[in-house]
Every structure is written in structure tokens, then in C-alpha cells.
Regions:
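Hydrophobic transmembrane alpha-helices and immediately adjacent juxtamembrane helices
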Residues: 1-263
Length: 263
């Protein structure tokens, strides 16, 4: 074995990490988020051990709803990344397609991918665990749409980053959703978070969506104020996401980033 050759290969990958902030953040990110998320979950169950009567059902329902967000955002990002990986990115923007047509096409394709991934999981939870997400009733459709809109919005943010910074931004596509998990209060109420994080969390639609999910399952009531707040925040973020997507496209076209990603 040649130590110099092995050292040379080590240096190559080391400098790749050193020269790329997204790669460095990716290494730090995963263990940090896991510790924070499960720390809050553990804190919740240690303080409010009797909060849920149907703990399994509520946690699984929230997990499935979170997967709607996850699948919709990742599906949108994957469609964008596949154009880069297949070296078709330049052709996509040379084609006689308007930018809004590309966005709408990706949105509906992401919806199909999301449903294909979710339906089997939803079907299996009933015979395996006796849990049915359909117990949410008609509000399920409202919650689904709200999560889907936010997932697409996150997809627009990440895709904007891909156009602005290139393929090195790819790691953010996989990690952005997990960053929101602790602040989104998926499995616990917002009161579990420290006060500083509560202020930030209140600006996320996820908090109101999952709070309303628990409210429906525990109390059998629908608080439309939570749903209204989630949709208002979704609208703000969606408008901002579309604007950022257009701005990133224009800057990438001027700087030639689109051509570089397609080669």
C-alpha cells in the first residue's frame, strides 16, 4: 500500500469539505438536530406523561402528516435535481417554457409522487397499529393542503439556492426539512420549547397545523383559527418563495450558473 496515494485522496476530500460551507454544515447538522429534536420529545414526555390518552395514534398520525411535508418538498427538489444530474438543466430553460409553467408542472408532479409514497404507508398503519389518519375527518384535507403548500414553498427555496449556488447546495435539499422538525412542534406543544425558540416557531405554519391535529384527536374539536393562521403564513412564504425563485433564475442566467450546472 502506498501511503502517499492514500494521503493524496484524503486531502482531495478534505479540501472539498473545507472549501464548501454547505458540506461543513451538513456534517454538524445531523447530530445536532437529532439531539435537539429527541431532547424536546423526551422533555415533553417527562413533564406531561399523561398528556395523551392515545399516544401511539397521535404520534403516528403526526408522523404521517409530517411525511406529507417531507415528501412534497423532497419530490419538488428531486425533480429539479434530476434535471441537473441528467445534464438536462440547460435544455430545460432553452425549451419554449415559461418559468411559471415549469413551476406549475413541478408542483403537480410532486403531488403525484407524494401520494404514491404516502398511500401505502397510510393503508399499512391501520392493520399493523390500529391507527387511521382518516379519524381526523374532513379537516384532514385542509391540513394536507396546508402541509403540501408549505412543502412546495420549501422546495422553491431550495431550488432557488441550487440555481444561485450550484450543486454544492444539494445537501441543503436533504437537510432543510429536518432543521424545521424541532421548531415545528410535530410531536409536542409549543410550550416545550424555550421562550426564544417559541418566538421563532410561531412564525412557522407547522406549529399551527400540528397543534390543530392534536386538538382534533384529543378533544374532537376543530379550531379554525389555527388553520387560518397556518394558511396566512403559507401564503406569505409561498409568495416570497416564488419571488426568490424568479430572482435566483435571473441572477443565474446573468452569471452563467445555469449553463455550468447543465454541463
Amino acid at each position: 500500500m502506498n501511503l502517499n496515494k492514500m494521503y493524496g485522496l484524503f486531502l482531495r476530500h478534505f479540501y472539498l469539505i473545507k472549501s464548501s460551507l454547505p458540506r461543513v454544515l451538513d456534517l454538524i447538522y445531523w447530530p445536532t438536530i437529532q439531539i435537539i429534536l429527541w431532547g424536546f420529545i423526551s422533555k415533553f414526555f417527562s413533564i406531561y406523561s399523561d398528556y395523551y390518552n392515545n399516544t401511539l395514534g397521535i404520534i403516528l398520525t403526526c408522523a404521517i402528516l409530517y411525511d406529507i411535508l417531507f415528501r412534497s418538498s423532497i419530490s419538488f427538489n428531486m425533480l429539479f435535481l434530476e434535471e441537473i444530474w441528467s445534464r438536462n438543466f440547460t435544455n430545460l430553460f432553452i425549451a419554449p417554457l415559461k418559468l411559471k409553467e415549469i413551476i406549475i408542472s413541478l408542483i403537480f408532479t410532486a403531488l403525484i409522487r407524494t401520494l404514491i409514497g404516502l398511500v401505502p404507508a397510510i393503508i399499512l398503519t391501520s392493520p399493523l397499529f390500529g391507527v387511521s389518519i382518516l379519524k381526523l375527518g374532513h379537516p384532514l384535507l385542509i391540513l394536507f393542503l396546508s402541509l403540501y403548500i408549505f412543502g412546495i414553498t420549501l422546495g422553491l427555496f431550495v431550488s432557488s439556492g441550487l440555481m444561485r449556488f450550484g450543486p454544492s447546495f444539494e445537501n441543503i435539499a436533504w437537510s432543510s426539512l429536518f432543521l424545521l422538525a424541532p421548531l415545528g412542534c410535530i410531536y409536542y406543544p409549543i410550550e416545550i420549547l424555550p421562550e426564544f425558540f417559541q418566538v421563532i416557531a410561531k412564525g412557522l405554519p407547522l406549529v399551527y397545523i400540528f397543534d390543530e391535529t392534536r386538538n382534533i384527536l384529543i378533544n374532537g374539536l376543530v379550531d379554525y383559527e389555527n388553520i387560518k393562521q397556518a394558511y396566512l403564513l403559507n401564503l406569505v412564504y409561498l409568495i416570497f418563495g416564488i419571488g426568490l425563485f424568479y430572482l435566483s433564475f435571473l441572477r443565474a442566467r446573468v452569471k452563467g450558473t445555469l449553463i455550468n450546472m447543465g454541463e
